């Protein structure tokens, strides 16, 4: 898996303003770009807010983008707590309150999508709109070969990851670069836990965009499954959209990309901006 990651490019010309917020025992790093309605970005496992680099300029053109480094990732040091999307969701809710925001749009990718999902489930009053990118909501949705690869994520794999952007980013920005092995152990333990959050989908109270690659780490049918739980794909949409999902939910399957290259598609930013700009469902 490490060999396939060396070609990933998260570079961007965008220059943000970095700050820290002390929430839930974390010294949580976040970086702001642009002005406008607040938009929180939550990265994937072993990454940082820099994962969104290719799409930040487009998103920041009309929003105040707040790119967060989650627990133990990027510039946010780890604490004595498991890597758990439900706990990290509490961190994001606390950050929104810390920033004095009434509400924010929240976009999460992969691990960050799980964090975004639970933020919306647990604190719906704080989330205006939710976007989950390449996010599986049950472990069994992932292809078996990917589950096998996830089972190899542990500290002793660090030596084989030195050429990957995840390792190089961590060494460049982490408060304790020597903790990369510890992060691998904690991420590996998190991914080894069975989970199925699909029943929680029905409780979502905020408009939600489900987005994935057409060659993601799970089949597109899983995204369709989640969309169906949001009243999507149940009937013809009608001439004026009267048959679209109640609640303003949407689905986007992006062509020609994978779980790892999805940020390279200009369609990702377009889909997110279009969804966030849509009128509230009645």
What does each model-identified segment do?
Residues 26-77:
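Conserved HGGG/HGGXW glycine-rich cap/lid loop of the alpha/beta-hydrolase fold
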Residues 114-122, 128-167:
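Flexible "cap/lid" loop of the alpha/beta hydrolase fold
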Residues 242-282:
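Catalytic active-site module of serine/aspartate enzymes centered on a nucleophile-bearing elbow/loop
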Residues 14, 67-107:
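Active-site loop/oxyanion-hole signature of alpha/beta-hydrolase fold enzymes
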Residues 184-200:
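Active-site nucleophile elbow and catalytic-triad environment of alpha/beta-hydrolase enzymes
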Residues 217-223, 234:
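Conserved alpha/beta-hydrolase "acid-adjacent" motif
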Residues 1-39, 62-63, 277-282:
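Alpha/beta-hydrolase fold catalytic core
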Residues 204, 210-212:
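Short beta-strand/loop motif that positions the catalytic acidic residue
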